Amino acid sequence: MSKPIRVRYAPSPTGLLHIGNARTALFNYLYARRHGGTFIIRIEDTDRKRHVEDGERSQLENLKWLGMDWDESPETHENYRQSERLALYQQYIDQLLAEGKAYKSYVTEEELAAERERQEAAGETPRYINEFIGMSADEKAKYIAEREAAGIVPTVRLAVNESGIYKWTDMVKGDIEFEGGNIGGDWVIQKKDGYPTYNFAVVVDDHDMQISHVIRGDDHIANTPKQLMVYEALGWEAPEFGHMTLIINSETGKKLSKRDTNTLQFIEDYRKKGYMPEAVFNFIALLGWNPGGEEEIFSREQLIALFDENRLSKSPAAFDQKKMDWMSNEYLKHADFETVYALCKPFLEEAGRLTEKAEKLVELYKPQLKSADEIIPLTDLFFSDFPELTEAEKEVMAGETVSTVLQAFKAKLEAMSDEDFKPENIFPQIKAVQKETGIKGKNLFMPIRIAVSGEMHGPELPNTIYLLGRDKSIEHIKNML
């Protein structure tokens, strides 16, 4: 009988939720929901130097914003933060010490650095050399007594089986194998401050919480043999491991870096700019996984139903900001008006543009939006000075029929009554200019659009003219003549 599926996302509260960590959480979430398993949030907060105030709250809030829920977490369960589990770690440290599978190490940082320097100078791969090698029992006891008398606080190191082979069948990458002799020697499982190291604590946590599958980024592959050593030393069965490929920048082909200014990499950024969470969820789900076929827009429920861990990609996932923005635009275009207006409203309010025309403006530009904050630059025309024309726009306005078109259309607007000035009545006036002048197509529409809005492209022209107002539209046309 197979074990119940229990997976976890275990962030460190050391900053904002990065797109890579969000993907780890999302794939674990999809896997659990697809197979009727349990999705657990555990906080790995033992790195006190990097601890960020409010880091945990920020992580959880952004996961909730994306649309994820979980079954167990620090919000509902005790001891789901590593800092609350120190007694448990100590119990297993003491067990390994008593069994001779671990030992206290008194070597100092200065001695380690000097040895590393010597090894590098000799062209050797840096590794820890057991400080007790060649010592008799009496010499060892004397060494320890002298070190303790000098106030040196020991670490605890796991005794590595140098001839051991540590292998697993990875859910993504297939068979992977490491030799114990290539790990770097006996490694620290408890630091001088009494806190466990990551590779020790995570094993105790995963065993204690009965985690069945560990799905994470492939930057953790090198951690896995160390974790398998701890499972072996404690006599526990290891979970299955799956290591997702790196996320790379689609433009540079290199690993996604926080210095890549052409990408939005933190979930907080998407929230602040007014993206729909459903769009971000959909986009992240396709970073390193796809269900097959050409379709790319999926609801959360569809993604859960389609998720198949066997389709996790073995190739790096390309993060393409343009693709993200295309997908976001698809979601905003097809969302109901109330949803989009609610996203745009805070931006309009902050800019002092929450006027009686606000709803009409959102409706006008809804098909163009990639994020709600774009409503401000898109509506500048209605609240700011006429924009400076680009060279391409100036070239259009230098056309020989432009003056004829603008004079004729200005006359049509001037002849319209206030009662008749509505979007549905403006388009017939443009067609009337076409009939009178014989000018049509781009030579007709483009000069009017540029004269009124200062742009070659935009929403429906009659709607733009209506919301701008007759007087302002006429004023803009006059300025072009």
From Swiss-Prot:
Function: Catalyzes the attachment of glutamate to tRNA(Glu) in a two-step reaction: glutamate is first activated by ATP to form Glu-AMP and then transferred to the acceptor end of tRNA(Glu).
Protein name per Swiss-Prot or TrEMBL: Glutamate--tRNA ligase
Motif interval(s): 'KMSKS' region: 255-259
Enzyme superclass (EC): ligase
Motif 'HIGH' region: chain residues: 11-21
E.C. number(s) listed in UniProt: 6.1.1.17
Catalytic activity: tRNA(Glu) + L-glutamate + ATP = L-glutamyl-tRNA(Glu) + AMP + diphosphate
UniProt record similarity statement: Belongs to the class-I aminoacyl-tRNA synthetase family. Glutamate--tRNA ligase type 1 subfamily.
